[in-house]
Regions:
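Bacterial extracytoplasmic/cell-wall-associated proteins, especially those involved in peptidoglycan
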Residues: 124, 130-135, 139, 146-341
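N-terminal type II signal-anchor transmembrane helix
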Residues: 1-38
Length: 341
């Protein structure tokens, strides 16, 4: 072979290698995503390779999808599909995406426990954020056996959910989710908080139950220790709490703007007009501010309170019933003036 032919042959080889490298780069390393923003692929436990392909196809460019399918065909992935929540970055190539999904390299999400009133609402929210079905969550929270495993019953299980933000994997199992919530709850109850509760004659459940009422009475964090102190005074003196939010909870009508006398006779253990002491469990998941307001309540002599007539969300406090009636009349007139029924 002449020198000229050798050079031509080498040039052809180099050209072919460049073309091959370009093809490999184009299909496996150029951007897989069809969007410029991060996308998430959610793979359920019952997904197979076909359903994964169906889910990921709308997210991909045509060349990226071709590269992905090639990798799928020449791997064990069809037999090893892993559930999870997988991030697809705008600059990722098909190889990076495939490797992440095949190896189960999912990205955790941040789940914030909401301050909801009922466990069906909690189940619905958590179910919308995690792979766990909301009906499965609600069934567990309504099961005395499950609740007792964590030291609660179906009326107090809300106490286990501290409204913080937690990082966890989307495909966490129900058991592991509940275990995590119990662990976080135990961590929340520091020695300082437990001691303050004990000094009041309270435990975790009683503290959270009162905090739930305080939170329903006011959203003003600065006023919560005052409200907590007022209810604590009533508990110590043996007076019924007479907390209107417990009537809403007993009636399961949270749209009520006013509580009328005929509503106060509702037959429910949560009716704090008919029953003395705390209700048998919280009427919502309270805020951390609400919990700490109970533990750090203001010591005062007030036994009554009524929403202020200026609708500021704060209250007029009173030491005597006569004084309270005057405050209540001012608030009633303000409600009537606004046509609130």
């Amino acid at each position: 072979m002449t020198t000229k032919n050798k050079r031509l042959y080498q040039a052809i080889i180099v050209f072919c290698l460049l073309v091959f490298s370009g093809i490999v780069y184009y299909y496996f390393f150029c951007s897989f995503s069809a969007k410029d923003t991060r996308q998430y692929l959610y793979i359920d436990d019952d997904d197979n390779v076909d359903s994964v392909i169906y889910k990921i196809k709308p997210m991909a460019t045509s060349h990226g999808m071709s590269g992905f399918l090639t990798l799928v065909r020449h791997s064990s992935y069809p037999e090893t599909v892993r559930s999870g929540r997988y991030a697809i970055e705008s600059g990722d190539g098909a190889f990076a995406v495939f490797r992440r999904i095949k190896n189960g390299m999912q990205e955790p999400l941040s789940l914030t426990i909401p301050c909801v009133r009922t466990m069906d609402k909690l189940a619905g929210y958590v179910g919308s954020k995690l792979m766990i079905d909301s009906a499965q969550i609600y069934h567990a929270l309504s099961d005395e056996t499950v609740c007792s495993k964590y030291g609660y019953d179906t009326l107090t299980i809300a106490c286990m959910f501290i409204p913080n933000t937690y990082d966890m994997y989307w495909n966490i199992s129900l058991d592991k989710f509940l275990d995590r919530m119990k662990k976080e709850c135990s961590g929340f109850w520091t020695e300082d908080r437990l001691q303050k509760a004990a000094d009041m004659g309270f435990d975790e459940v009683k503290t959270i139950t009162l905090a739930s009422i305080v939170d329903e009475e006011t959203t003003n964090s600065a006023e919560k220790p005052m409200v907590a102190g007022m209810y604590y005074n009533r508990l110590k003196s043996g007076m019924p709490l007479q907390a209107d939010p417990t009537i809403k909870f007993a009636l399961k009508d949270f749209s009520l703007k006013r509580i009328y006398h005929n509503m106060l006779s509702v037959n429910s253990p949560f009716n704090t007009y008919r029953n003395t002491g705390l209700p048998p469990g919280p009427i919502r998941i309270p805020t951390i501010d609400g919990i700490d307001a109970v533990l750090n309540h203001v010591a005062h002599d007030y036994l009554y309170m009524c929403a202020k007539e200026d609708f500021s969300g704060t209250h007029n406090f009173a030491k005597t019933y006569d004084e309270h009636l005057k405050n209540a009349e001012k608030y009633s007139r303000a409600l009537n003036a606004r046509g609130i029924k």
